[in-house]
């Protein structure tokens, strides 16, 4: 069976959408990973089909090495397949799309590819630059120099590209930063301006970046597991498709891409102009970040540690348990969403929460609870504590589900102690399964030192630990007593009974 290519697809009589190979290169993309290809490039591909934008993407590998990737994907005409697999509106989704939006992949650490990148920089066709260079990518490296070919850091590469474009008298571009850090576009622009200062470049160039370019902060949300790891399943998929594709990527159906900017972007971005679901332009992505953190991430952190203690191992199984699913939904709809009403449309939040349940019930992803439990103390502080405090401030009452989640979090760290070693706290849950709780060292040391302490004292010491929470949680009226009582139920009757009580 042949690898995917334009010729291979023609041979098998492929009838789907394909952008011609010679379409103009309108996008320069820093990053070539599964996320960009399955999420961002799929948006461009569908935007091309819907609007006739007719733009190809040049992928740039942002770090040295891995030359085999560029050579491999170029050998198959930069075509690849995205499988969308999961649950949507309660229905199982398993569909494929050939992505034809990419023209080539270059690695600027090869001299010819560096020159090719700079040729794209001054192209009249270039309109948009996209990046996802991981959380570590938007960082300042003082060793970068203006004449490096290329500089090591991504912001230095990008400012070098933009300076070359400005010097050639070309118009500005839109920059869409997709890295998973807060205010990604603003931070990227700040670091680029630092290089302009370091390198003594012209004030006129800084003004061009500020006035002629649009550097956007964006917020992305989808799960991209990447590739199919089971060889038998991969072979079955290839048989179904009619070709081999070593660069196939898998993702879930849910997609959300919030782009911070003005109304003009709606006409300039083909996927927004097409009205594709899940992508939108907004003056401020901050409320949507809050929605994601408090609903999606907050739900995980609230029910997962307790569900592990109850004997569950993967997220999907939790969604098939009426008590756990009910606990999560009661928390989201009765406790979390009401606190978001000042910033967000409540009906949108409810739709987002409904999508969360579908995402957690994905039949194609075995999402291990224990992996989600990493650093749960800091996660609960960032994701769930603000909602608890907002709820108390707005209603004068304790949110029962969120308060119970604190009790089950304590239970997660205080199962039978096996040992405190290295970077973990080794514990044994009731069914005999041994596990390692991983968190900040001070958290693990605290719980190891409290092994055998009675629960009333334990809860008091946890809630008054300002290193954990940044404040004394016993100052929240009634919380200490509630958590002591909920933890007593967990110890005597199990987590599921505590979850059930919180819903009554």
Feature map (PLM): residue ranges:
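Substrate/ligand-engaging "lid" and interaction regions
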Residues: 1-504
